[in-house]
A protein has these predicted regions:
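Structured adenosyl-cofactor binding patch, chiefly the S-adenosyl-L-methionine
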Residues: 238-277
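Short acidic/polar active-site loop segments enriched in Thr and Asp
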Residues: 73, 141-142, 250
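RNA substrate-binding interface of SAM-dependent RNA methyltransferases
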Residues: 36, 109-205
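N-terminal positively charged helical leader segments and presequences
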Residues: 1-7, 11-13, 20, 27-108
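Glycine/charged-rich beta-loop-alpha catalytic/anionic-binding loops adjacent to active sites
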Residues: 57-59, 113-117, 224-227, 246-254
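Non-catalytic positions within long, well-ordered alpha-helices that form the structural scaffold/packing
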Residues: 68, 136-139, 245
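Active-site/ligand-binding-proximal alpha/beta "capping" segment
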Residues: 202-241, 249-254
């Protein structure tokens, strides 16, 4: 899958100035005259295939279409990312009707941010898509949707394979716009029990009015993974709160006002990144 950011055309032949285990060193070899990260003015193409210096990539029909819209021709410089820690710079070799070829000039591996995992309620589709976009910009490590007991019945709702595909596309676009290197790992719809079992050992919080300030709870070991649970707008059922408490989830507060789940998610992630990096 390839997605582009709609930036001004870049046809110059001159290079622009400028988380997971690191792959082998030779994969990220960079020629001294070609910096891996180009100017943000260059259009970006996200690949699900890993990047490798000097490799030739064949981009699909969507990417070729966007290249034609941007009037990119052979010799144009583009940015590349794979969503798994690699970013780089490439040169367009050919733009055809159904595909395009790009030569990877250089790439580099970007270490992942300290892990912050997000458990979200299944809710209104557009609001979930918006949160997925912002979660990507803020560097969420994973995204796990849960059907809580008090989740409201809305239509259309953000669930199922079709929604998950739309979410991945939205996240891909957000990654390109933000200049990030890692896409959140999207998990399928699950239950409270499944999300608890999947949470890694570390700092666990559930957003709940009356809890301790979230910044204080997240100020512990900076290397420990963080899992943040967002409840539905109807609130968490007492039985769900009991399950979370038994699994070590501490109630955390974002202040005295009542926030929508997507606002709370953005605020919690922003605090986590400010406190933990």
């Amino acid at each position: 899958m390839f997605v582009t950011v709609h930036s001004p055309p870049a046809t110059s032949h001159q290079p622009s100035a400028t988380n997971h285990q690191s792959p082998a060193t030779n994969r990220y070899h960079q020629p001294p005259t070609a910096p891996a990260i180009a100017s943000v003015s260059l259009p970006t193409f996200l690949s699900t295939d890993p990047l490798a210096a000097e490799a030739s990539l064949t981009l699909g029909e969507d990417a070729a279409h966007h290249m034609r819209v941007l009037r990119l021709e052979a010799g144009a410089r583009v940015q590349l990312a794979d969503g798994q820690g690699s970013r780089g710079v490439g040169t367009v070799v050919r733009v055809a009707k159904r595909n395009a070829t790009v030569q990877v000039d250089s790439c580099e591996y970007v270490d992942p941010l300290p892990p912050v995992h997000l458990v979200v309620p299944i809710a209104d589709r557009e609001r979930m898509l918006w949160l997925g976009e912002k979660a990507t910009e803020l560097g969420a490590s994973s995204w796990r949707p849960v059907m809580f007991k008090r989740s409201r019945s809305v239509s259309p709702r953000g669930e199922g394979p079709t929604f998950q595909q739309r979410l991945r596309l939205r996240m891909a676009s957000a990654l390109e716009q933000s200049g990030g290197a890692w896409l959140p790992m999207p998990f399928p719809d699950s239950t409270v029990e499944t999300s608890i079992a999947a949470a890694p050992p570390g700092i666990r919080v559930v957003l709940e009015k009356g809890g301790a300030p979230i910044a204080a709870l997240l100020a512990g070991d900076s290397s420990a993974p963080v899992t943040i649970v967002l409840g539905p707008e109807g609130g968490l059922d007492p039985s769900e709160l009991e399950l979370l408490a038994a699994a070590g989830f501490l109630p955390a507060s974002l202040g005295s006002t009542l926030l929508r789940f997507e606002t709370a998610g953005v605020a919690a992630l922003a605090v986590a990144r400010a406190v933990r990096g």
